[in-house]
Amino acid sequence: MLTYPNIDPVAIHLGPLQVHWYGLMYLLAFLCAWGLASYRAKQRDGWTSDMVSDLVFYGALGVVLGGRIGYVLFYEFDKFLENPIWLFQVWTGGMSFHGGFLGVMIAMLFWCKKYQKTWFQTLDFVAPCVPTGLMFGRIGNFIGGELYGRAVTDPNYPFGMIFPTDPLHLVRHPSQIYQALCEGLLLFIILWWFSSKPRPRMAVSALFLMGYGVARFVMEFFRQPDADQGFILFGWMTKGQILTVPMLLIGLWMMWYAYQKKIYDWGPQKNS
């Protein structure tokens, strides 16, 4: 069994100002996305550093607003009704990927209108930069001791740990780390490699939806369902899995459509 590194949730103390690890992870996520997007812009015609900076700003707004609102609506609506101010206490944790995803989609519409880019041109450009943000977010969950995994059933399992935030004090899977590695690092490697060569428009976005859909669906088997949600369908499907299935199906259709149309935005087969 591993020992949980009981880290102070406040990363930096500056007098009355406290910087929480959760907020710091989001800052690192946005900085990493900006760096990766800036690198990609240098490899593509029609992209500038100002466009990238604006894109990250729009994306950050979409992630924070959509992620928080989505978490409240999907998972903690009763808590919000009891204390509406809690919606704005982002540093306490509680963000929904699916809400953040929808928030980014809406934000990208405004950015595309401003810079005269198509939606899928933009999403294909952004998609490989997203998984690193997911990775940092899950690390923030781990440090905060939230969204931990299900109880370990094998007493000889070497990676289980007891989270101090768990009222039952059971040996559990560190599912946040599993998700950081699968939904974050592994998906980043796959998307970065796939997007390094000319692909049909929508293909990179499709692979992101498919890759995240598979990774999240599998990781949910290790993650403890929210206490007020439990298993919603068939006695084993969680809210996260139900929300992820449409992403996977849409991604499959998009990949098929992309290779049927074969519209290229860069490379030797670029279409005007």
From Swiss-Prot:
User: What is one Gene Ontology biological process annotated in the Swiss-Prot or TrEMBL record?
Assistant: lipoprotein biosynthetic process
Q: In this entry, which stretches build a coiled coil? A: none
Please give the start and end residues of each transmembrane region.
17-37, 55-75, 90-110, 125-145, 174-194, 202-222, 230-250
Q: Which family does it belong to?
A: Belongs to the Lgt family.
Q: What name has this protein been given in UniProt?
A: Phosphatidylglycerol--prolipoprotein diacylglyceryl transferase
Q: Which organism is it from?
A: Acinetobacter baumannii (strain ATCC 17978 / DSM 105126 / CIP 53.77 / LMG 1025 / NCDC KC755 / 5377)
**Location(s) in or outside the cell:** Cell inner membrane
Q: GO cellular component terms?
A: plasma membrane
Role this protein plays: Catalyzes the transfer of the diacylglyceryl group from phosphatidylglycerol to the sulfhydryl group of the N-terminal cysteine of a prolipoprotein, the first step in the formation of mature lipoproteins.
**GO MF assignments:** phosphatidylglycerol-prolipoprotein diacylglyceryl transferase activity
Residues at which a 1,2-diacyl-sn-glycero-3-phospho-(1'-sn-glycerol) binds = 138
**HAMAP family attached to this UniProt entry:** Lgt
List, alphabetically, the PANTHER family matched: PHOSPHATIDYLGLYCEROL--PROLIPOPROTEIN DIACYLGLYCERYL TRANSFERASE (PTHR30589:SF0), PROLIPOPROTEIN DIACYLGLYCERYL TRANSFERASE (PTHR30589)
Which keywords, in A-to-Z order, does the entry hold? Cell inner membrane, Cell membrane, Membrane, Transferase, Transmembrane, Transmembrane helix
Please give the pathway this protein is involved in. Protein modification; lipoprotein biosynthesis (diacylglyceryl transfer)
Gene encoding it? lgt
- State the Pfam families in the record: LGT
Task: Give the main localization category.
Answer: membrane
What EC number(s) is this enzyme filed under?
Answer: 2.5.1.145
Q: How does it sit in the membrane?
A: Multi-pass membrane protein
